[in-house]
């Protein structure tokens, strides 16, 4: 009983306040995970790993290509891309810089990235990822070719001339 009384009377050890992760570090972890997803997605294309590449998309994802006609659902994009994956190498994009932002609840992210591409030259990608079942998935991706402002008047004229050409008949190759 004396032992119990001594324990009860002893001053309690001061409790340490729970340690909080620094705000920057807490926000950095999802950004690193998102960058890893995007890097793996680009590597999957270079390795022609179709299942891995398309596995990074949500079921209702949209891919916007560089041509004005290129707006595809994930499944439409997969059909379009199938011949590229079948030949053993799709495309090779490498991010040289990337910015990632997160929603307050951490369930949605958006990004932009500068890309180095051997076939198209410098490109830019931007998009939205959502967290599904604990994994980040691409819900929307927009690929573009940045045009220096000084070159825009020439490109504008070339695009206008291109659009004045008659559209190909059904079944003919596109005017690309």
Label each residue range with its predicted role:
Residues 18-34:
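N-terminal low-complexity, Pro/Thr/Ser-rich intrinsically disordered segments
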Residues 47-60, 64:
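Short, well-ordered alpha-helical segments enriched in acidic and aromatic residues
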Residues 1-8:
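Bacterial N-terminal signal peptides
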Residues 8-14:
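Boundary at the C-terminal end of the N-terminal hydrophobic targeting segment
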Residues 63, 76-122, 171-176:
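Surface-exposed, charged secondary-structure patches
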Residues 132, 140-176:
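Low-complexity, intrinsically disordered terminal/linker segments enriched in charged
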Residues 38, 57-58, 67, 97-99, ...:
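A mature extracytoplasmic/lumenal domain signature
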Residues 30-46, 54:
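Mature N-terminal segment immediately following signal peptide/propeptide cleavage
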């Amino acid at each position: 009983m004396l032992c119990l009384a001594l324990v009860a009377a002893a001053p309690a050890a001061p409790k340490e306040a729970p340690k909080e992760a620094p705000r920057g570090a807490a926000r950095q972890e999802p950004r690193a995970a998102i960058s890893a997803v995007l890097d793996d997605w680009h590597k999957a294309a270079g390795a022609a790993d179709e299942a891995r590449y398309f596995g990074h998309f949500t079921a209702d994802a949209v891919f916007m290509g560089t041509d004005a006609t290129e707006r595809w659902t994930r499944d439409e994009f997969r059909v379009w891309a199938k011949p590229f994956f079948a030949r053993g190498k799709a495309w090779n994009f490498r991010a040289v810089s990337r910015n990632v932002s997160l929603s307050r609840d951490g369930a949605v992210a958006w990004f932009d990235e500068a890309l180095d591409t051997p076939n198209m030259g410098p490109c830019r990608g931007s998009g939205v990822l959502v967290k599904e079942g604990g994994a980040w998935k691409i819900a929307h991706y927009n690929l573009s070719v940045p045009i220096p402002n000084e070159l825009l008047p020439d490109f504008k004229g070339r695009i206008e001339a291109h659009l004045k050409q008659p559209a190909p008949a059904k079944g003919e190759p596109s005017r690309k």
